[in-house]
Amino acid sequence: MKRDFIDTKDYTQAEIQYLIDLGLQIKKDIKAGDYPQLLSNRTLGMLFEESSTRTRVSFETAMTQLGGHAQYLAPGQIHLGSAESESLGDTAIVLSRLVDILMARVATHDTIETIANAATVPVLNGMTDYNHPTQEIGDIITMAEHLPAGKKLSDCKVVFVGDATQVCVSLMFVATKMGMQFVQYGPKGYQIKPETLAIGQKNAEVSGGSVLITEDTDQAMRDADFVYTDVWYGLYESPLSYDERMAIFYPKYQVNDELMAKAAKHAKFMHCLPANRGEEVTDSVLDSDASVAWDEAENRLTAMRALLVYLMAPIIDYSDDTLNNLKDPALKDLLNNRIDSTK
């Protein structure tokens, strides 16, 4: 049975931990010069309704590094669900006959669900108006790489500063799934909606994590291990003007040296990028030693490699020769012990 990656709610804590381990293992091997050809002769179809830098480049690079190929499919170049063209469902069915896996970055969550329901190959959500799950995996990998001494993920506190964007919501999903303390520090009217917050609270009940929404600076930042923000204007639709948005968030919700000083001394700064320097974050923070934003961007690639291998593993019959040719036995062990709660 095929599995999609539309929302981390469909994945267990153990499966997400497996994706972390798999991603870091492949990253380690590639850094050592070993490019495991796990996706040889496989093709990824990439559907983009929205523009992208990190998502597109990381998926294309991941496929190339692992021996496969990626095709970029823009709405103006193919028939994609408009009134004058093929339906979304029919497009997904056709593409399923031509590629091995699909990724779509689309404007609405209904669109990705329509594609996933019709496709007969695995479908990855490259971002919708609701969530950004591939970013979630890159983020949790980054936090796993930069854990404070003596701490596990479940011991850590992550604070999202600002508006309840798709990235904020997605960070809550994965942090609470992994037993972390999640805080959104943002103004009323721009906080996570109750029905969405309930998902994080349910995750926390199971994992032992916690969720807090607050406007109190000291309460939010106290003992924070990771401080995360996203843009205030430009990437997301808003009826407000630039000046109106700035008046809501600036200066209280800007991540600057003063705000970082309220977090734990070892706290790391994160940003999904692109950043509007001088708005949601200052140069002094983004370019500081505490910033792991560039590692986070690189780990989009780490996440994509893990997700592609994980989702395609059931349809690829790895021969003993392929596995035995892997230079690192740790990767072979991971592939032989794939965690899948659907089985």
From Swiss-Prot:
Transmembrane segments: none annotated. The record marks 27, 145 as: Important for structural integrity. One of its GO terms (molecular function) is amino acid binding. Carbamoyl phosphate binds at residues 52-56, 105, 132. It catalyses: carbamoyl phosphate + putrescine = N-carbamoylputrescine + phosphate + H(+). It is an enzyme of class 2 (transferase). Keywords: Cytoplasm, Polyamine biosynthesis, Transferase. One of its GO terms (cellular component) is cytoplasm. The keyword Cytoplasm applies. Putrescine binds at residues 271-274. Its EC number is 2.1.3.6. Pathway: Amine and polyamine biosynthesis; putrescine biosynthesis via agmatine pathway; putrescine from N-carbamoylputrescine (transferase route): step 1/1. Catalyzes the phosphorolysis of N-carbamoylputrescine to form carbamoyl phosphate and putrescine. Is involved in the degradation pathway of the polyamine agmatine. Belongs to the aspartate/ornithine carbamoyltransferase superfamily. PTCase family. Homotrimer. This is Putrescine carbamoyltransferase.
